[in-house]
């Protein structure tokens, strides 16, 4: 129910609830302000992708973002497939780019966590290689805790070219790399920056890391050789956020 509350009402195309949910939450739909179709518990379980559904399901309109949205430069939140712009007054302020770039990320939980963390850390958007996990994967959606409805994202077929494009626009690109010569918290992220995070098992592909302006590493103690992709992304994004709060 919490995630449904986070969805902008104009994006909800259809809403379904189970008989049990309606019985336990008689005032919920009225307070939500969206009409819902009631399904029997059996039918609801059939259409749901979880074993123990909570009893509420929304069909939501997909939105298309642009690179300007990812960089925090666009006054419009996003672009719908119809081509119409959905205005969001809260997003009219142009922000300093703070981008997370994901190369062949595969785990839905990791991507969802990165969305949630990116919003909390003040990132402007997420750039993904076309072979990364689908943002609309149900597991991704749930693990974002609603951040997917607010954090711009954009898939690209040629990630190395996209990284070079960021650099050409004055956005310094940092590749999280085990062989990074620079320590992450000794860099300056107060200007436009982008952090490159690689695949869970293989890290960044060479053709991607070679395009970065700088290779950085996160010092670690003990016998740990690397961090989870979502954890590494969180460390870097929050360091940028910390520096920008000064």
Which residues fall in each region the model found?
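Short, acidic/turn-prone active-site loops that include or flank metal/cofactor-
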Residues: 20-22, 41-44, 131-133, 200-202, ...
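Structured adenosyl-cofactor binding patch, chiefly the S-adenosyl-L-methionine
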Residues: 117-121, 135, 140-148, 206-246
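N-terminal positively charged helical leader segments and presequences
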Residues: 1-51, 79, 83-87, 92
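RNA substrate-binding interface of SAM-dependent RNA methyltransferases
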Residues: 1-10, 17, 73, 79, ...
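General small-molecule cofactor/ligand-binding pocket signal
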Residues: 36-40, 154, 216
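Acidic/glycine-rich phosphate/pyrophosphate-binding loops and surrounding catalytic core
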Residues: 49, 56, 60-73, 91-94, ...
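Glycine/charged-rich beta-loop-alpha catalytic/anionic-binding loops adjacent to active sites
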Residues: 70-72, 95-101, 211-220
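Active-site/ligand-binding-proximal alpha/beta "capping" segment
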Residues: 174-224
